[in-house]
C-alpha cells in the first residue's frame, strides 16, 4: 500500500528518493513527501497531496542537497489525504515514515499530549515521532531509543527513523509490513519494495519479522526481535530493471495483459519435461509430503481467492483431493477444524498480503501437514515463512488490477494438481493431458489477444451503464467472479458474479434492458444448462454478451452479442476465458475515463488489515 524509500550516501539523494517513490506508485497512494538532511544537519521537508510529480516539482524548486533522507507515499488509513497528514512526520529533530497501522495510537496520543506534545496531524504515525523524541530525552543512541519505542507499539508497521542532528544513520523496524535493505558501495538504502531501489543496487537483504536495523553509509547492523545481532542473507535481485516501463503500451494493465503468453511460458519453463510435470524445485522431501495429503485448504484474498476457487474444481475432479477455499481475513478470525493430513496453500502475488500472512502464521499452531506458498515475489515474507514454495514467473506486475499474476497462479496450480494427482494414483492420462494443454496455452492466449479490437467495439455498449452481471457454471463461475472484480476495480461499474444456476434465486429480479449480462460459455458438459440460463435472461429483456466456444452453436440475435472464441481443451478453459474479460474491463475503463493502473481507493499490495 504505502511506499517507503530511505538513503544514506555521500552524494545528494533527493532524486534517488523521488525516483524510488515513482517506482512505488503502482502500490497506490494519495500523497507523497520526503525529508532530506545535509551534512550540517539542516532538515528540509516537502509534502504534497496527489501524485509524485507534484513532489518532484517542489523539490526542483528547492534545489535540495543532502546525503541522508527518507521519503514516503501515503495511502490514507487515519486522517484524510492532506499535506498535514502526509509523511514524513517530525518531532523537533526526529523524522519518521511509516507503513501500517498503530492500533493503540489513541492512548499513546493521550499520553503524549499529557507530556506536552502537540499534534499537527490526524495520523497514527505522528505518535511514533513524538515517542522517539520523548525517549531520546531519556538518553541513549537512536538505535537504543527505537528499540525502547518498539514494545510500546501495537499493530503492523514498517518504519524508518531519522535524527537530523546525526545524519550518518537511519534506524528501521519491521513488524508485519515489509522492509528491504539495498546494499551499495559507500552508500546503503531502505525501501518497502526492492523495485524502488533497482536503479541504485541489485543486492538486497530482506528483513524478517521483528527485525530492527541500523543503516549507515558503510554498515548494516541487524537485530532480531530478541535484540540479538544477526546476519541476514544478501540476495542478488532477478527482477528486471525495466519492469516499470510501459514501453509501447498506454497502460501497465494493457502491457501486462499482452505479456501473459510469455509470462506463462516463463512459468512453465523447466517444469514440463517428456510429458511429465517436474516440481523438483520443491525439494527432495516434497513428494513424500504431497503423497500424504488428504485435504487441501487454500487461503487467499481478492484475485488470488478467485484463482483458488478455480483450483478447487481441479483438485477435486482431477486429483480426487477434497479442497476448501477461504478468504484470509475470514479464516484468521474464526475457529476452524483442521482435517487430518491437510495441506495449507497460500496464494499471493506480492507475498506480503497482510491477512494471508497472518493466516499462514496462525496455521502453524493448528496442526496442518505443511504449508505451500504460490507467489510471484521471491524472497517475500510468504515464501520465506512457508514450508514449500512455487514461484509464478510473471515478472513485476504494476497495474493494481491483477492480470498475468492471476493466469500464472492458475498455471502453477494446475501443475500442482497434476503432480498431487499422480502421487495419489490418478489415471496416468491426467498428467499427460495437463502437460499437453499447458504447452499449448501460450499460443492459445496469443489467438485470444488477436480479438482485442472486437472486444474493444463491444465495450462501447457499457458507456452509460452502472451495473453488470457475470454468469458462469462449474470452473467458469470463479472466472465470472474474476471478470466482475476486474470491471468494478477499474471502471467503477458495480458488477456481481453468480453461478448461472442461481439466477432464479434472486438475480433475475435485476434483469432489464439496462443490465448487461456477461456470460462465459465454453463447450463443455454444462453448456446446455447454461443455454437455458441464457434464455431466462433473454426472456426478460436482458442485454447479453456471450463469450462462447466457436463450436458451442451460438449466433447473434436481438439483445445477444456473441463473441466466438477458438476452441481450447476444457482443462485450460478457465485460464483462457479470463483474458477476454480482462480486455473488456480494460476497454470499458478507457471509455469511462478512469485511472486504469491506479484506480481510486485501491492499492496493489494490501499490507495492512
Curated annotation (Swiss-Prot):
GO terms for biological process: carbohydrate metabolic process; fructose 6-phosphate metabolic process; protein N-linked glycosylation; UDP-N-acetylglucosamine metabolic process. It is found in: Cytoplasm. GO terms for cellular component: cytosol. The keyword Ribonucleoprotein does not apply. Its main location: cytoplasm. Keywords: Aminotransferase, Cytoplasm, Glutamine amidotransferase, Repeat, Transferase. Signal peptide: none annotated. InterPro entries: GATase_2_dom (IPR017932), GFAT (IPR005855), GFAT_N (IPR047084), GlmS/AgaS_SIS (IPR035466), GlmS/FrlB_SIS (IPR035490), Ntn_hydrolases_N (IPR029055), SIS_dom (IPR001347), SIS_dom_sf (IPR046348). It is an enzyme of class 2 (transferase). This is Glutamine--fructose-6-phosphate aminotransferase [isomerizing]. It comes from Yersinia pestis. The gene is glmS.
Amino acid at each position: 500500500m504505502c511506499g517507503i524509500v530511505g538513503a544514506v550516501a555521500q552524494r545528494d539523494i533527493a532524486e534517488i528518493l523521488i525516483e524510488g517513490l515513482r517506482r512505488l506508485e503502482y502500490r497506490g497512494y494519495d500523497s507523497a513527501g520526503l525529508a532530506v538532511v545535509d551534512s550540517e544537519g539542516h532538515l528540509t521537508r516537502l509534502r504534497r497531496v496527489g501524485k509524485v510529480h507534484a513532489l518532484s516539482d517542489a523539490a526542483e524548486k528547492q534545489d535540495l542537497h543532502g546525503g541522508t533522507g527518507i521519503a514516503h507515499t501515503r495511502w490514507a488509513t487515519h486522517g484524510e489525504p492532506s499535506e498535514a497528514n502526509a509523511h514524513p512526520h517530525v518531532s523537533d529533530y526526529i523524522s519518521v515514515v511509516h507503513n501500517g497501522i498503530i492500533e493503540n495510537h489513541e492512548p499513546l496520543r493521550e499520553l503524549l499530549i499529557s507530556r506536552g506534545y502537540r499534534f499537527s496531524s490526524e495520523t497514527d504515525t505522528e505518535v511514533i515521532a513524538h515517542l522517539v523524541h520523548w525517549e531520546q530525552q531519556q538518553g541513549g543512541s537512536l538505535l537504543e531509543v527505537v528499540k525502547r519505542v518498539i514494545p510500546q507499539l501495537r499493530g503492523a508497521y514498517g518504519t524508518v527513523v531519522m535524527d537530523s542532528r546525526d545524519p550518518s544513520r537511519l534506524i528501521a523496524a519491521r513488524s508485519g509490513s515489509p522492509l528491504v535493505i539495498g546494499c551499495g558501495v559507500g552508500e546503503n538504502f531502505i525501501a518497502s519494495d526492492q523495485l524502488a531501489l533497482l536503479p541504485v543496487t541489485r543486492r538486497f537483504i530482506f528483513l524478517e519479522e521483528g527485525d530492527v536495523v541500523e543503516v549507515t553509509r558503510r554498515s548494516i547492523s541487524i537485530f532480531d526481535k530478541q535484540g540479538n545481532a544477526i546476519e541476514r542473507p544478501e540476495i542478488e535481485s532477478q527482477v528486471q530493471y525495466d519492469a516499470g516501463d510501459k514501453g509501447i503500451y498506454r497502460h501497465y494493465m494493457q502491457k501486462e495483459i499482452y505479456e501473459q503468453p510469455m509470462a506463462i511460458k516463463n512459468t512453465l519453463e523447466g517444469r514440463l519435461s517428456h510429458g511429465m510435470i517436474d516440481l523438483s524445485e520443491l525439494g527432495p522431501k516434497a513428494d513424500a509430503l504431497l503423497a500424504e495429503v488428504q485435504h487441501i485448504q487454500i487461503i487467499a484474498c481478492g484475485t488470488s481467492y478467485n484463482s483458488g476457487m478455480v483450483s478447487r474444481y481441479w483438485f477435486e475432479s482431477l486429483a480426487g483431493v477434497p479442497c476448501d477455499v477461504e478468504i484470509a481475513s475470514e479464516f484468521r478470525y474464526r475457529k476452524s477444524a483442521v482435517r487430518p493430513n491437510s495441506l495449507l496453500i497460500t496464494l499471493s502475488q506480492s507475498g506480503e498480503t497482510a491477512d494471508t500472512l497472518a493466516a499462514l502464521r496462525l496455521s502453524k499452531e493448528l496442526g496442518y501437514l505443511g504449508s505451500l506458498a504460490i507467489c510471484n515475489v521471491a524472497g517475500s515474507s510468504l515464501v520465506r515463512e512457508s514450508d514449500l514454495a512455487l514461484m509464478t514467473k510473471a515478472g513485476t506486475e504494476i497495474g493494481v488490477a491483477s492480470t498475468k499474476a492471476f493466469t500464472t497462479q492458475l498455471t502453477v496450480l494446475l501443475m500442482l494438481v497434476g503432480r498431487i494427482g499422480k502421487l495419489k494414483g490418478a489415471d496416468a492420462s491426467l498428467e499427460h493431458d495437463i502437460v499437453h494443454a499447458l504447452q499449448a496455452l501460450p499460443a492459445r492466449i496469443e489467438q485470444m489477444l488477436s480479438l482485442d479490437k472486437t472486444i474493444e467495439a463491444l465495450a462501447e455498449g457499457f458507456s452509460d451503464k452502472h451495473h453488470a452481471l457475470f454468469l458462469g457454471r462449474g470452473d467458469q463461475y470463479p472466472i465470472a467472479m474474476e471478470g466482475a472484480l476486474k470491471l468494478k476495480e477499474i471502471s467503477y461499474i458495480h458488477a456481481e458474479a453468480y453461478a448461472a444456476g442461481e439466477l432464479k434465486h434472486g438475480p433475475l429480479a435485476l434483469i432489464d434492458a439496462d443490465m448487461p449480462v456477461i456470460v462465459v460459455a465454453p463447450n463443455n458438459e454444462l453448456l446446455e444448462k447454461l443455454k437455458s440460463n441464457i434464455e431466462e435472461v433473454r426472456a426478460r429483456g436482458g442485454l447479453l454478451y456471450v463469450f462462447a466456444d466457436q463450436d458451442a452453436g451460438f449466433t447473434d440475435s436481438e439483445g445477444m452479442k456473441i463473441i466466438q472464441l477458438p476452441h481450447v481443451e476444457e482443462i485450460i478453459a478457465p485460464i483462457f476465458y479470463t483474458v477476454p474479460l480482462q480486455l473488456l474491463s480494460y476497454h470499458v475503463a478507457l471509455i469511462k475515463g478512469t485511472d486504469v493502473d491506479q484506480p481510486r481507493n485501491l492499492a496493489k499490495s494490501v499490507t495492512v488489515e
